[in-house]
Amino acid sequence: MNLDALQQRLGYRFSKPELLQQALTHRSHSAQHNERLEFLGDSVLNCAVADMLYGMFGKLDEGDLSRVRANLVKQQALYEIAQMLQLSDTLRLGEGELKSGGFRRPSILADALEAIVGAVFLDAGFDAARALIRKLYIPILEQVDPRTLGKDAKTLLQEYLQGHKIALPQYNVIATHGAAHSQQFEVECTVPKLEVRVFGTGASRRAAEQAAAKLALDEVQKLVPQLLKRSRAERTGKTRKQPQPQDPQLSLRLKE
């Protein structure tokens, strides 16, 4: 298997190419598979990402750092990076996995990426693995807000309203549809002060509330800047209309 193109995309060339080949080998293909490398890579990845976040975001507390890290190393994030690296083109899968589309499966691709991190660690040590992880993650971190990454819509809406001293939203289930085993909930979310009223649906009350909160947040983020602008304009207008106090010395001089 020619892995030159993948090594170029990784920005790292293995001194022991067999480690990379093993990292790309699923257990359905061979007994010499990537699961041990995946175990190792998972730990290296968590440590390197924690180190990177600690250095980049000095104002985030422990809870926020943990939240951001969890979102960066979860399966979906690893899957998206694996797609960017085109790992599906280089995976070694058994015949059954190939036929079932295993090369597209998020779990298999995410595991392979962790195994590659483990392989780099064995090939050249922690510094090399950390350099690879930084190369993969820095472009992602430049496009996200660490203060909001991983927070759900209800939390974001609540924090936004609290930040502008607006009363919290109200959620009410207004309808349920379908049979008991496949119900759909419809939830109303209102922000009375801003006259926002939206509706969300979902397979559970929580999912419906999240859907409604997302719509409400979109509306609130449009309205609040307009209200702030209007409020500033009104304050400026009142200031301009106030009469200037008369200088008493000037008044005396005029009388003379």
From Swiss-Prot:
<protein>
    <recommendedName>
        <fullName>Ribonuclease 3</fullName>
        <ecNumber>3.1.26.3</ecNumber>
    </recommendedName>
</protein>
<dbReference type="GO" id="GO:0010468">
    <property type="term" value="P:regulation of gene expression"/>
</dbReference>
<keyword id="KW-0963">Cytoplasm</keyword>
<dbReference type="InterPro" id="IPR014720">
    <property type="entry name" value="dsRBD_dom"/>
</dbReference>
<dbReference type="GO" id="GO:0005737">
    <property type="term" value="C:cytoplasm"/>
</dbReference>
<dbReference type="GO" id="GO:0006397">
    <property type="term" value="P:mRNA processing"/>
</dbReference>
<keyword id="KW-0699">rRNA-binding</keyword>
<dbReference type="InterPro" id="IPR036389">
    <property type="entry name" value="RNase_III_sf"/>
</dbReference>
<dbReference type="InterPro" id="IPR000999">
    <property type="entry name" value="RNase_III_dom"/>
</dbReference>
<keyword id="KW-0694">RNA-binding</keyword>
<dbReference type="GO" id="GO:0004525">
    <property type="term" value="F:ribonuclease III activity"/>
</dbReference>
<keyword id="KW-0540">Nuclease</keyword>
<keyword id="KW-0698">rRNA processing</keyword>
<feature type="region of interest" description="Disordered">
    <location>
        <begin position="229"/>
        <end position="256"/>
    </location>
</feature>
<keyword id="KW-0460">Magnesium</keyword>
<feature type="active site">
    <location>
        <position position="42"/>
    </location>
</feature>
<dbReference type="Pfam" id="PF00035">
    <property type="entry name" value="dsrm"/>
</dbReference>
<keyword id="KW-0378">Hydrolase</keyword>
<dbReference type="Pfam" id="PF14622">
    <property type="entry name" value="Ribonucleas_3_3"/>
</dbReference>
<comment type="subunit">
    <text>Homodimer.</text>
</comment>
<keyword id="KW-0819">tRNA processing</keyword>
<dbReference type="GO" id="GO:0019843">
    <property type="term" value="F:rRNA binding"/>
</dbReference>
<dbReference type="GO" id="GO:0046872">
    <property type="term" value="F:metal ion binding"/>
</dbReference>
<feature type="binding site">
    <location>
        <position position="38"/>
    </location>
    <ligand>
        <name>Mg(2+)</name>
    </ligand>
</feature>
<feature type="binding site">
    <location>
        <position position="114"/>
    </location>
    <ligand>
        <name>Mg(2+)</name>
    </ligand>
</feature>
<feature type="binding site">
    <location>
        <position position="111"/>
    </location>
    <ligand>
        <name>Mg(2+)</name>
    </ligand>
</feature>
<comment type="similarity">
    <text>Belongs to the ribonuclease III family.</text>
</comment>
<dbReference type="InterPro" id="IPR011907">
    <property type="entry name" value="RNase_III"/>
</dbReference>
<feature type="domain" description="RNase III">
    <location>
        <begin position="3"/>
        <end position="125"/>
    </location>
</feature>
<comment type="function">
    <text>Digests double-stranded RNA. Involved in the processing of primary rRNA transcript to yield the immediate precursors to the large and small rRNAs (23S and 16S). Processes some mRNAs, and tRNAs when they are encoded in the rRNA operon. Processes pre-crRNA and tracrRNA of type II CRISPR loci if present in the organism.</text>
</comment>
<dbReference type="GO" id="GO:0003725">
    <property type="term" value="F:double-stranded RNA binding"/>
</dbReference>
<keyword id="KW-0479">Metal-binding</keyword>
<feature type="active site">
    <location>
        <position position="114"/>
    </location>
</feature>
<dbReference type="GO" id="GO:0006364">
    <property type="term" value="P:rRNA processing"/>
</dbReference>
<dbReference type="GO" id="GO:0008033">
    <property type="term" value="P:tRNA processing"/>
</dbReference>
<keyword id="KW-0255">Endonuclease</keyword>
<keyword id="KW-0507">mRNA processing</keyword>
<feature type="domain" description="DRBM">
    <location>
        <begin position="152"/>
        <end position="222"/>
    </location>
</feature>
